[in-house]
């Protein structure tokens, strides 16, 4: 089996476990949402209350805590033609240096599949275990009057049958207003826009290069305290992948959340994706002081996609 063939099969196996399968995007580690709360709400990342680095770094200014840390895992259903379980795992931390500044660091890993190798005659050779990881940094600055800007950068290492390294960047801005009223009830509004996964192609050698899945994302979230112990929230966001040019993709997701006593939450939503990559989403969460526990399940609506679950734990100090 030649190198190019191995790379193509490895990409297909990785993609078979992710939403990006039909679109030729073999770097789903840069685009898959690792935050369980927003995953349950149609992957509307503007509603992030954790995993700020990978969703909306500016949202850290909505909390009165100085330090935040999160860990999450997304596990996908078994991919056809591969052994093992594909998963994406993430760690992130953020720290507010002052009233207007915050910095972030994180790490992501995607892998878990094993592919059977063979030579040109079909004889078995060694197994191949593709994986990707990223080392990530971020910074956000509060401009004032609810506005903030942010930027993140990622060092990428990708192993198929050959290795490739590269970099990706994200720039965005957000607006928050926590002094709103809706029907005489206190409300909080968050708006977010960004361009992500910007960077040069990854070069695996032998003329095989992979274009990063660059996208534009816009979203918003609104929460309302309808009573002393009852809060409802809604979120909506869209993403348009315009790179690679031959694999353009539009996704739109939204969801609702009900929270009792600022402690227990239930969530549901729907994510539309071109080319039968849609999901029904659902989940629940628990919060106690600074501790956050969340879980989500994303159920595919067609064979082209993949069902998966996400669990996350976080703490704000």
Where are these regions (language model features)?
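Bacterial N-terminal signal peptides that target proteins for export
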Residues: 1-7
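Bacterial N-terminal signal peptides
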Residues: 9-16
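Sec/Tat signal peptide C-region and signal peptidase I cleavage site
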Residues: 17-22
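Subset of outer-membrane beta-barrel
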Residues: 23-317
């Amino acid at each position: 089996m030649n190198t190019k063939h191995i790379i193509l099969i490895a990409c297909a196996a990785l993609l078979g476990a992710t939403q990006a399968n039909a679109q030729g995007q073999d770097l789903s580690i840069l685009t898959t949402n690792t935050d369980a709360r927003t995953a349950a709400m149609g992957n509307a990342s503007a509603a992030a209350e954790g995993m700020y680095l990978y969703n909306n770094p500016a949202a850290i200014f909505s909390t009165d805590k100085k330090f935040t840390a999160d860990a999450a895992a997304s596990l996908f259903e078994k991919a056809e033609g591969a052994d093992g379980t594909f998963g994406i795992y993430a760690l992130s931390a953020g720290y507010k240096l002052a009233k207007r500044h915050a910095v972030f660091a994180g790490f992501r890993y995607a892998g878990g599949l094993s592919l059977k190798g063979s030579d040109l005659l079909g004889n078995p050779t060694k197994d191949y275990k593709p994986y990707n990881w990223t080392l990530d940094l971020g910074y956000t600055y509060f401009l004032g009057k609810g506005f903030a800007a942010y930027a993140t950068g990622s060092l990428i290492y990708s192993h198929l049958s050959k290795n490739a390294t590269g970099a990706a960047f994200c720039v965005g801005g957000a607006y928050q207003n926590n002094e709103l009223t809706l029907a005489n009830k206190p409300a909080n509004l968050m708006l977010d826009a960004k361009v992500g996964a910007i960077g040069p192609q990854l070069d695996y050698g032998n003329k095989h290069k992979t274009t990063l899945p660059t996208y534009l994302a816009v979203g918003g979230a609104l929460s309302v305290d309808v009573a002393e112990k009852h809060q409802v929230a809604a979120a909506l966001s869209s993403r348009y992948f315009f790179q690679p040019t031959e694999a353009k993709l539009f996704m739109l997701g939204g969801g609702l959340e009900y929270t009792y006593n600022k402690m227990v939450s239930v969530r549901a939503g729907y994510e539309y994706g071109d080319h039968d990559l849609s999901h029904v989403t659902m989940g629940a969460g628990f919060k106690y002081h600074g501790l956050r526990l969340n879980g989500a399940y994303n159920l595919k609506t067609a064979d082209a996609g993949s069902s998966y679950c996400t669990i996350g734990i976080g703490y704000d100090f």
